[in-house]
C-alpha cells in the first residue's frame, strides 16, 4: 500500500504569478490544499524537499500528513507542474482525504519474472502497452504499484488487465473491456538473398555482357 509521509508547509499570503515568482526566489514552492468540503488553502513548501519527493517516484500515489501551522491534514498529491526547461517544480496541488473517501488514481505497473519469461528467452521483445492502470481505491489503502507476472507469457501472446490481481477494495475505472497490458513481439527474421541471384550480379547490380561473336572471314574469289 502507499507509504504515508509527513510534510511541513506554511500558509501562503499572496496569490498570482507575481507572488508565486517571489515565493520561488525564497526557495519555496507554491501549492494548494483543496477538497473534502473545506475551502482551498494556499500553502508553500520547501523546494529541496518537494523536488526530492517528486523525483523519488510514486509521488502521486503517496499519502502525506501535511502540517500547516501545527494542524495536520491528510492529503494526496493530485497534480504538479514542472519548469519545461529546468525540470524544477513550480506548483503542486493536494487533495484532502476524509475518512471513507474513494479516489481515482493512476497506479503504475511493475513487470516481474522477465528473466524466466519463455517468450523473451526465445528471442521475443516485451512491448508494454500500458505503464499504469486507472483504479478506484480507498483513500486509506491506496496501492503504490501493481504487479504483472510475465513467467508464462509466450511469443505472440498478450497479457490483459484481468491477469493482474487488484488489492482488496480496489476496482477498475474502465470495466467495459479486458484491455491489453503487454505483448511479446516475435523476433524479426531477415531472409538471406538466394546464392544464384547474388552470383549473377556484378558491379552496379548488372551481369557482364557476353563477348561479341568473331566476324566471319571473307570468302576468296
Swiss-Prot record:
Pfam short name (any one): Ribosomal_TL5_C
Protein name, per record: Large ribosomal subunit protein bL25
NCBIfam families according to UniProt: bL25_bact_ctc, PRK05618.1-2
Recorded GO MF terms: 5S rRNA binding; structural constituent of ribosome
Gene Ontology CC terms, in alphabetical order: cytosolic large ribosomal subunit
SUPFAM superfamilies the UniProt entry points to: Ribosomal protein L25-like (SSF50715)
Listed CDD domains: Ribosomal_L25_TL5_CTC
Record carries keyword Endoplasmic reticulum: no
UniProt region (Disordered), positions on chain: 198-221
Residue ranges with Low complexity bias: 208-221
Keywords: Ribonucleoprotein, Ribosomal protein, RNA-binding, rRNA-binding
InterPro entries attached to this UniProt entry: Rbsml_bL25/Gln-tRNA_synth_N, Ribosomal_bL25/Gln-tRNA_synth, Ribosomal_bL25_b-dom, Ribosomal_bL25_C, Ribosomal_bL25_long, Ribosomal_L25_dom, Ribosomal_uL5_bac-type
Any single GO BP term: translation
Assembly behavior: Part of the 50S ribosomal subunit; part of the 5S rRNA/L5/L18/L25 subcomplex. Contacts the 5S rRNA. Binds to the 5S rRNA independently of L5 and L18.
Task of the protein: This is one of the proteins that binds to the 5S RNA in the ribosome where it forms part of the central protuberance.
UniProt similarity note: Belongs to the bacterial ribosomal protein bL25 family. CTC subfamily.
